[in-house]
Design a protein with these regions (language model features):
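N-terminal small-domain helix-loop-helix segment of the aminotransferase-like
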Residues: 2, 6-104, 111
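Conserved core of the PLP fold type I
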Residues: 63-207
């Protein structure tokens, strides 16, 4: 017997993936240059040359160590470099020990949700949202996913709806800007208003 909730997820293929496969099938017929695929965020420009050079330098090193395990937190020198970059740009005082590297954003979100979720917690996502958020929250972290609709005229945050959704069980709000899939970028005014609302709710409920 397998987990029925996971089986249900597997029985419903992602609409995004369906569109992606349709784009591939059309490209095989009419040519890739004639298909404009907006289904998946694949890059349409090459990586910076510095990235290419760095990859080549890594592959030219010890061929055995290249394919070995790193620290569970990620390579120490990379974490130190990232901490230095954050400190330089934002005036922070991070060290490499403050950072944890993952293989992509999905793994980072999943780990973070599981790390902070407790029984009965709720996570708020702002629609439209990346569908896997719901799976990370409910199946991965065992929490409740609460969806707040956007202000449809500009896809900024509907603060009346958000304020209504916030309660003592709210553990986190997932903020994604530029938004996936709408592409909307939250304005400075939106971010400041969000910070004010959260400060108000923190005082009301006695916790972040």
């Amino acid at each position: 017997m397998i987990n029925q909730s996971m089986a249900a997820l597997g029985n419903n293929r992602s609409t995004i993936r369906e569109l992606f496969e349709y784009g591939n099938s059309r490209a095989a017929v009419v040519g890739r240059e004639n298909v404009f695929d907006f289904s998946i965020g694949n890059p349409n420009v090459p990586a910076p040359d510095a990235v290419r050079r760095a990859i080549l330098e890594e592959t030219a090193g010890d061929p055995v160590a290249l394919h070995g395990y790193t620290s569970a937190q990620g390579a120490a020198d990379v974490r130190r470099t990232l901490a230095d970059d954050l400190n330089r740009r934002f005036g922070t005082d991070y060290t490499g020990d403050c950072l944890y590297l993952t293989a992509g954003a999905a793994a980072a979100l999943s780990c973070a949700f599981q790390a902070i979720a407790c029984p009965g917690d709720e996570f708020i996502v702002l629609a439209p949202y990346f569908p896997e958020y719901k799976m990370f929250i409910e199946s991965g972290a065992g929490a409740k996913c609460v969806v707040v609709p956007p202000a449809v005229q500009d896809f900024q945050i509907d603060f009346a709806a958000l304020a209504q959704a916030l309660n003592a069980r709210t553990k986190a709000i997932v903020i994604n800007s530029p938004n996936n899939p709408s592409g909307a970028v939250y304005s400075e005014q939106t971010i400041r208003r969000l910070a004010g609302l959260l400060a108000e709710k923190e005082e009301q409920y006695g916790h972040p």
